[in-house]
Amino acid sequence: MLWIWAVLPLVLAGSQLRVHTQGTNSISESLKLRRRVRETDKNCSEGLYQGGPFCCQPCQPGKKKVEDCKMNGGTPTCAPCTEGKEYMDKNHYADKCRRCTLCDEEHGLEVETNCTLTQNTKCKCKPDFYCDSPGCEHCVRCASCEHGTLEPCTATSNTNCRKQSPRNRLWLLTILVLLIPLVFIYRKYRKRKCWKRRQDDPESRTSSRETIPMNASNLSLSKYIPRIAEDMTIQEAKKFARENNIKEGKIDEIMHDSIQDTAEQKVQLLLCWYQSHGKSDAYQDLIKGLKKAECRRTLDKFQDMVQKDLGKSTPDTGNENEGQCLE
């Protein structure tokens, strides 16, 4: 009976040793497998890419990858890019093609070479426009010279105009010096005459503020949106949308829906803001939004349009006399 108790510890120790050995072997096999995977990643020859467990050939220009290859050195399943909308100009293994560049006619650009499956669109400045920076997205209208041209405008440089002679400048300065006091005297005379007329005619005392409503909070902006968009670049329209809390996903959706029509993209970006904002206080908030997006030129034109329309829409019998007093 005593020999059983003596042998039992030896049996248990042997069992634990076998379990430990099996666990060590399992870890060793896992490390070997990982090492083989890493070696497979590094074993792809130059020009091949790792597609699952295999080294695959890239897709050719004008195509995109649909599925990886099924054997080492094999060719993946590739599909052509969308003609006229997408391109790929080199060997690759991406599952998407690049989008073709659009030439914005509203900003002086026109197509030089159409987009193909293997080449992006090439844009150039329209006649009488130029751009002096690389990767140009906005061409500028060539200057017109009042005193003659030294060098004509080209696609990459503005017109070089002949400068005005010092003698002409002296004449101009003299005229300005004489005109300034005359204008001052004339304006003072008109104000005095206007004040007297208003005193004599009670009906004409109506303030000009009544002819142009002070509160434009409920002014409908629907008819102004296309005219505002026409004056903005697509970058300014996108910046306006971002600065006024339009989500990036919605901006991308609008850009994709009208991918070939820059003018429509700009209109839809502004309409998206207007629809989400509502009519109430839209006039004041649009002005704030344009300032925030640094669209000063567009803001000035918009205010001029509204001022002009409001002036026409409010007839008044005293307008003629009052208009002369606005100076």
Curated annotation (Swiss-Prot):
TNFR-Cys repeat ranges per the UniProt record: 43-79, 80-123, 124-162
UniProt region (Interaction with HIPK3), positions on chain: 204-309
Superkingdom: Eukaryota
Subcellular localization(s) per the UniProt record: Cell membrane; Membrane raft
A Gene Ontology term for the protein's cellular component: membrane raft
Membrane topology value: Single-pass type I membrane protein
Residues modified to Phosphoserine: 217, 220
Biological process annotations from GO: activation-induced cell death of T cells; apoptotic process; apoptotic signaling pathway; B cell mediated immunity; cellular response to lithium ion; circadian rhythm; extrinsic apoptotic signaling pathway; extrinsic apoptotic signaling pathway in absence of ligand
Tissue specificity as recorded in UniProt: Detected in various tissues including thymus, liver, lung, heart, and adult ovary.
Keywords: Apoptosis, Calmodulin-binding, Cell membrane, Disease variant, Disulfide bond, Glycoprotein, Lipoprotein, Membrane, Palmitate, Phosphoprotein, Receptor, Repeat, Signal, Transmembrane, Transmembrane helix
Protein's recorded name: Tumor necrosis factor receptor superfamily member 6
Entry-listed glycosylation sites: 43, 114
Disulphide-bridged cysteine pairs: 44-55, 56-69, 59-78, 81-97, 100-115, 103-123, 125-139, 142-153, 145-161
Region (Disordered): 308-327
High-level lineage: Eukaryota, Metazoa, Chordata, Craniata, Vertebrata
Start and end residues of each Death domain: 222-306
Signal peptide: 1-21
Species, as recorded: Mus musculus
Record: disease: Defects in Fas are the cause of the lymphoproliferation phenotype (lpr). Lpr mice show lymphadenopathy and autoantibody production.
Segments in the Extracellular topological domain: 22-169
